[in-house]
Amino acid sequence: MNTARLNQGTPLLLNAVSKHYAENIVLNQLDLHIPAGQFVAVVGRSGGGKSTLLRLLAGLETPTAGDVLAGTTPLAEIQEDTRMMFQDARLLPWKSVIDNVGLGLKGQWRDAARRALAAVGLENRAGEWPAALSGGQKQRVALARALIHRPGLLLLDEPLGALDALTRLEMQDLIVSLWQQHGFTVLLVTHDVSEAVAMADRVLLIEEGKIGLDLTVDIPRPRRLGSVRLAELEAEVLQRVMRRGHSEQLIRRHG
């Protein structure tokens, strides 16, 4: 196991991380510490830097300035410990379900792929084609494909956004259950504030490339939908987001 891994999860430390695209500053000297094994949700308005943060952590982009560390090790040096899920499951239609789970692996991987499919409730669909699966089932396959690598860091970029309400709730429960079993660190980007407070230990609001709100979700698990405390935390985040939006409208109106 890599020395940067603690308790099976990857600890993250971002020091003054910035990301610029020409004159557009997306992340602006962002500082962030995430302990190993924590479940963090990231919310904010479109264009605020949420997905850019995930792409930096996934190694898909490099920061303009600053350090991205796993403990004391540059995260880029242990990128094999990181896996990412998107809103689109990105399954190859010409490969079977089990072959999609084992994509890129060598050696004797099929038993591990079957265990990963069993963990997401699809052990009986291993030989089928992706076209035979529902949207929720395809996302379960994508989750199994991430699990087979035993990640220390799981990055989720709106993975449930295209699902119907009931399937979305089932997937939320599944992801939380697997996180509790395996102890990996999770960063979930979502536009759904209720989803953020229902799933995460901690909710971050990114505004103008910085952390505008860092909220601890102090509710024991399993969490009950409709609880007063969940509603209070959701309202706190939404009020902050809306207050910022109102201020921007006033500036445009009177500037």
From Swiss-Prot:
Location relative to the cell: Cell inner membrane
Membrane topology annotation: Peripheral membrane protein
Catalytic reaction(s) noted: ATP + H2O + aliphatic sulfonate-[sulfonate-binding protein]Side 1 = ADP + phosphate + aliphatic sulfonateSide 2 + [sulfonate-binding protein]Side 1
GO cellular component: plasma membrane
Residues holding ATP: 44-51
GO molecular function: ATP binding; ATP hydrolysis activity
Organism domain of life: Bacteria
SMART domains: AAA (SM00382)
Gene3D superfamilies cross-referenced by the UniProt entry: P-loop containing nucleotide triphosphate hydrolases
Key words of the record: ATP-binding, Cell inner membrane, Cell membrane, Membrane, Nucleotide-binding, Translocase, Transport
EC number: 7.6.2.14
Transmembrane portions of the chain: none
Pfam families recorded: ABC_tran
Positions of the ABC transporter domain: 12-233
Keyword Transport on entry: yes
NCBIfam families: PRK11247.1
Family, as annotated: Belongs to the ABC transporter superfamily. Aliphatic sulfonates importer (TC 3.A.1.17.2) family.
Function: Part of the ABC transporter complex SsuABC involved in aliphatic sulfonates import. Responsible for energy coupling to the transport system.
Subunit structure of this chain's protein: The complex is composed of two ATP-binding proteins (SsuB), two transmembrane proteins (SsuC) and a solute-binding protein (SsuA).
Protein name: Aliphatic sulfonates import ATP-binding protein SsuB
